[in-house]
A protein has these predicted regions:
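Generic N-terminal amphipathic, Lys/Arg-enriched alpha-helix
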Residues: 1-13
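A polyanion-binding, active-site-adjacent surface
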Residues: 3, 15-163, 167-170, 175-176, ...
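Phosphate-/nucleic-acid-contacting segments
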Residues: 197
């Protein structure tokens, strides 16, 4: 599994991947993929890093868990492959972008186009057993991704962190808010959005405004 971590990220992750917890995590994930159907495909476990090299990173969007249904998870938070029905949270993300930026609702839910512009679409837990949400939580992934967020905060400047929902907001403790922009709010899930905690946050225009002020190319959402 360690071999799947892209070269551009190895420099800031080499210390944590040598720790006992990561060795235990590797053994757990290897066993799970051998004995059960798991998502995403093993080759896509670190897709969030592979599609967004460290030197191109501008934005971090944090999710919690990969999709646990067949054909959905591809290693990027909130993203689904082309021609796959958009999950409810992704629909609400696109609706907010529509309103915030006056752009058309996209046909595809594949967010690799965002990743290639410098957005890391990171789930706190990078794997899951099929049809069992949260089944790979508390096995070491959270330690790995918390460390990753902390290292990114130290290494980089003027990034935008989009933290949606209570779980994601707790990750702000790993981010230096004096050198990065943290945009936090309700989760885009229908439960949260229908209570008024999602729509109207204007996170996407605020993100672009911050990037522009800091001399970075805006995201084509």
């Amino acid at each position: 599994m360690q071999k799947l971590i892209p070269n551009s990220w190895e420099t800031i992750l080499k210390d944590t991947t040598k720790l006992p917890y990561f060795k235990a995590l590797k053994a757990f994930v290897s066993s799970e993929y051998k004995e059960h159907s798991c998502f995403p495909k093993q080759a896509d476990i670190f897709a969030a890093l592979a599609l967004c090299p460290l030197d191109q990173l501008k934005v971090v969007i944090l999710g919690q868990d990969p999709y646990h249904g067949p054909g959905q998870a591809e290693g990027l938070s909130f993203s689904v492959p082309n021609d796959i029905k958009h999950p409810p949270s992704l629909i609400n993300i696109f609706k907010e972008i529509e309103t915030d930026l006056s752009v058309s609702y996209p046909k595809s839910g594949n967010l690799s186009r965002w990743a290639k512009q410098g957005i890391m679409l990171l789930n706190a837990t990078l794997t899951v057993r099929a049809h069992e949400p949260g089944s790979h939580q508390k096995q070491g992934w959270e330690t790995f991704t918390d460390t990753l967020i902390h290292k990114i905060s130290l290494e980089k400047s003027n990034l935008v962190f989009l933290l949606w929902g209570g779980f994601a907001k707790k990750k702000s403790k790993h981010i230096d808010s004096s050198k990065h922009l943290i945009l936090s709010g309700g989760h885009p899930s229908p439960l949260s959005a229908n209570r008024g905690y999602w729509f109207g946050n204007e996170h996407f225009s605020k993100c672009n405004a911050y990037l522009k002020i800091n001399g970075k190319t805006e995201i084509e959402w």
